[in-house]
């Protein structure tokens, strides 16, 4: 595992062909050729981890746009990378837990112990209907997720495992080989409702947050640590998302910010954004400008000159953040620039 004394730099793999809802062509296609090239290069320039989102439809560019499957992509990336941790999203409503545990354990072996999970309770009703998955009320999703995690943990850690619950049933399940990382690959999850936060504090290893200021993130970290203590469990890790770019002058920063936040409510991703708002419970309302960038990324304040971003990264470290999950556009070019101006100067 990487040293815990240094904040780690991760990035979202562009499986949707971009992160900007108002820029139609971001110069980074949703293709295996692009993501494999990006992953291999990212290892060389200082990135530690990549988050691979799981959606069967494209919520950024519109439902008709291409999107890559998370788990077949992650298996292929595991075989062509050497050091990059692969945090792959998984929605329990789309995966039987015991079968999924078998597949994930195999990918952990392909990667030689570099797999991590990002467990996500489904929010997109249209996608669920299209793909024949159950779509439950908000808190019911977390009941399913809790039981799903119990089965996952059981088959990964026990020689044989049986379970009879509300959602899942297994009888004497044997899973070999076990994952490389013991007792299991790290489990990350995010959420802002009470049901989500209590579940994560009790059953997960790390809490990931949408973009927000260091001050608000610090309060969330303190809250989750308190919840964790109530369950008598050990240290959690914390990650936060952010949209990032660096320029040499504040004038150039302002110009790029204007380009990416040029609001178009008729963009194909706008309807998907509205469905996401209806399917989640947020602690803070979003502005229409923030809609332009995925995952509330602008709130993290990771745009500016290299010196300004260095200062903001330091504030996140002080807030208790272990991992930044960054989005860029166009991805490869901006990741190179960010590495040169920020990562390699730390």
Feature names for model-found ranges:
Residues 2-5, 11-15, 44, 131, ...:
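An alpha-helical appendage that flanks or caps ligand/catalytic pockets
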Residues 18-33, 89-98, 134, 181-192, ...:
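Active-site mouth loops of central-metabolism enzymes
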Residues 33-53, 199-210, 315-321:
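Catalytic domains of carbohydrate-active enzymes, especially glycoside hydrolases
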Residues 1-80, 180-185:
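N-terminal beta1-alpha1-beta2 module of alpha/beta enzyme domains
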Residues 9-11, 50-52, 86-90, 115-119, ...:
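Hydrophobic faces of well-ordered beta-strands that scaffold small-molecule active sites
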Residues 9, 42, 46, 77, ...:
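Conserved, mostly hydrophobic/aromatic
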Residues 61-87, 144-148, 230, 336-346:
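Alpha-helix-loop-beta-strand connector modules within alpha/beta enzyme cores
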Residues 2-4, 43-44, 74-83, 104, ...:
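Acidic (Asp/Glu)-rich catalytic clusters
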